[in-house]
């Protein structure tokens, strides 16, 4: 009986559980979106909130009208990516985590609550193996 | 008249055009999914096919049952992320590009055609500013 239940509901031990929360963040204070250190700090904190293990984090600044900041954190074995465009007061955020106990939505909401976009969207994609 | 049309259909010069193609790739030859150099080479070629400008590419190998390879390319100003789990013959792929002329779908399909998953999904998310 338990074996039958097990085959109907595969154990999370037997597959990769991938959770990807992503969205677009509109109308943000442009000064925040130029502050590479602040943005990297938010992503670092988000890694903890999502219950992920950080492997490496890196950030870059880009000049020009369509410039801004990119922060990418590699975690085991997925990523957080935050891209900003200060002239457009715009940012996009992807929080992709692995593991049944990870919480990408909490990490996404943490960054949103700090950047305070006037509008934003949040979507979920299942990145699990079969 | 042209001004009116312009306000109805905003010029792509006036906003960030972000295109994100992503999906899960099932049942891949596990030897391919352990070959960090091969996977990094595929992502580098995909950057060109998508008509993106590479800023930096990096790859990592992870051991253990849930290990594999991660390759992340930062491009101006978005990313390609390929994560693999060889024990599960599984990979996920995100090709997120900026610019009206970029072609993330061609890059996605290039990597799929090389990894030859028995099944895969492909989704599109609009990451453009308003």
Swiss-Prot record, chains A, B:
Assembly notes: Heterooctamer of four alpha and four beta chains arranged as a tetramer of alpha/beta heterodimers.
Official protein name in the record: Arginine decarboxylase proenzyme
Enzyme Commission no: 4.1.1.19
Post-translational modification note: Is synthesized initially as an inactive proenzyme. Formation of the active enzyme involves a self-maturation process in which the active site pyruvoyl group is generated from an internal serine residue via an autocatalytic post-translational modification. Two non-identical subunits are generated from the proenzyme in this reaction, and the pyruvate is formed at the N-terminus of the alpha chain, which is derived from the carboxyl end of the proenzyme.
Catalytic reaction equation(s): L-arginine + H(+) = agmatine + CO2
Record-annotated site: Cleavage (non-hydrolytic): 77-78
Keyword Transmembrane helix in annotation: no
Active site residues of this protein: 78 (schiff-base intermediate with substrate), 83 (proton acceptor), 98 (proton donor)
GO BP annotations listed: arginine catabolic process; polyamine biosynthetic process
Pathway: Amine and polyamine biosynthesis; agmatine biosynthesis; agmatine from L-arginine: step 1/1
Molecular-function annotations in GO: arginine decarboxylase activity
Statement: the UniProt record of this protein carries the keyword Lyase: yes
Residue numbers bearing the Pyruvic acid (Ser) modification: 78
Organism: Sulfolobus acidocaldarius (strain ATCC 33909 / DSM 639 / JCM 8929 / NBRC 15157 / NCIMB 11770)
Phylogenetic classification of the source organism: Archaea, Thermoproteota, Thermoprotei, Sulfolobales, Sulfolobaceae
């Amino acid at each position: 009986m338990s074996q039958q239940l097990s085959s109907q509901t595969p154990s999370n031990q037997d597959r990769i559980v991938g959770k990807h929360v992503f969205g677009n963040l509109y109308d943000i204070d442009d000064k925040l979106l130029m502050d590479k250190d602040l943005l990297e700090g938010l992503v670092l904190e988000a890694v903890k909130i999502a219950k992920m293990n950080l492997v490496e984090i890196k950030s870059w600044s880009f000049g020009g009208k369509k410039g801004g900041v990119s922060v990418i954190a590699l975690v085991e074995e997925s990523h957080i990516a935050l891209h900003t465009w200060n002239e457009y007061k715009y940012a996009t955020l992807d929080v992709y985590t692995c593991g049944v106990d990870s919480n990408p939505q909490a990490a996404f909401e943490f960054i949103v609550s700090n950047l305070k976009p006037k509008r934003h969207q949040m979507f979920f994609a299942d990145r699990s193996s079969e």
